[in-house]
Amino acid sequence: MKHFSLLIAFFSLLFSSCAEQQIANAPPSTYELKQNYPNPFTDSTAVEYGAPYVEPNSAAPWIRVVVFDRFNQKQAILVDNGAHPAGRFKVTWYANGVNGFTVAPGVYYIELQQINLSGPSLGEDVFTLLRIAALKQ
């Protein structure tokens, strides 16, 4: 039974998130998505994004960072965080798709989606889009 649990843990790690998130430093004044590096990339690429400080009486926004292919098919969800804290963050994408397998070489797009959960701009989305390139591994 112990080996079965270890096997499940291994496959959960293998097929779970294809990104990791690290806090970088002080929050920006507006939402931002910086160009990935390296670009083009082979096995992984890092993307930095930022969320500004939100007033204490306001709900923090929902933030998503999503990778799409050239056919607008979702390939990876790097961040999907409700009540996202303010700050600058770095996400590393290991070129894995939503199915857990490595994506094909080609052009991809990283999109920052910000959904307001309260206030006068309730439900409004803010989108920022970057073009990236994956090379053959």
Q: How does the language model describe each region?
A:
Residues 40-41:
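Acidic, glycine-anchored loop motifs typical of Ca2+
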